[in-house]
Amino acid sequence: LPGNVIYELIHNDRVIGGLNAASTNKAIEFYSQFVKGQLHKTNCRTAEMCKLTENSSRDVQIAFANELSLICDKAGINVWELIELANKHPRVNILQPGCGVGGHCIAVDPYFITAEYPTESKLIATARGINNYKSLWCAEKVKTAILEFELQNKRKPVVAMMGLAFKPNIDDLRESPSKNIVSRVIQICNNADILIVEPNVKEHNQFKLTEYKEAYGKADIVVMLTAHDQFKTLPYDEGKVILDFCGV
C-alpha cells in the first residue's frame, strides 16, 4: 500500500477466508480490532483469488491505456487529451498510461493466474505482455531521440531520466518499469551523458542520482518516467526535447 499505508490499512474493506471456519473467525476477530471497513467472510480459495483478481483487473485496465498511447503516438494524437475527452462519457473510465506497470502486486499477481490457467487467461496474459512491452517501447523512443539530437547538433546530449519509483510520490522501486528503462537506455545508448533522478530516494546501489532541478537544468533531453509532484513545478523550456511517458 505505498503512499497511503495507514489510511488503507484501517479503512479498506477486507475479504477474509481461512482454511476452516475457526481460522476464518479468528482472522475476523483480529482485523475487527483496527479495521473500520467491512469484513467479508468467504473461503480461502476465493479470498486468495480475490486478491489476484483485483490486481489483474488493474493490470488489464492499465494495459488498455498503454495500448492507446502506442496507437496515439503512431496516429499523431495527444493521448492525454483523448482520454480526458473519452472519460466525459458517463460509462467510460480509462486510466492514465505510463511507462509500464510496477510494484510488488499488480506487476506480479497476474502471473499466478496465467501459470495455473494458461488456456483460460488469454486476456490477462496479453495485458501483461502489453505492459511489459511499453517499457521497451519507451527505451526505444529515448534511443531515437538521442540519435536525432546527435545528428542535428553534432554532439552527444545530456539526458535526464526523471523518476525511478513505480508510481508518483513514493520511494518504492520494486518491479519499477522506470528503473528498467533507465538500465536499458544506459545499455543501448552508452555514448550519451545520462543523469538519473529520483527525488524520494537519497542514494541507490546501482545508479548515481542527481538532484532533479540540477538534472533538468543541464539536460538537452528530459525523459519523464514517474509523475512526481516535484517534476510538475519545473518550468517549461522549449529548448529541451521532452519525452513525457507519464503525463507530467
For the regions a language model picked out, list residue spans one by one:
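Structural/interface elements that position substrates and couple domains in central-metabolism enzymes
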Residues: 1-248
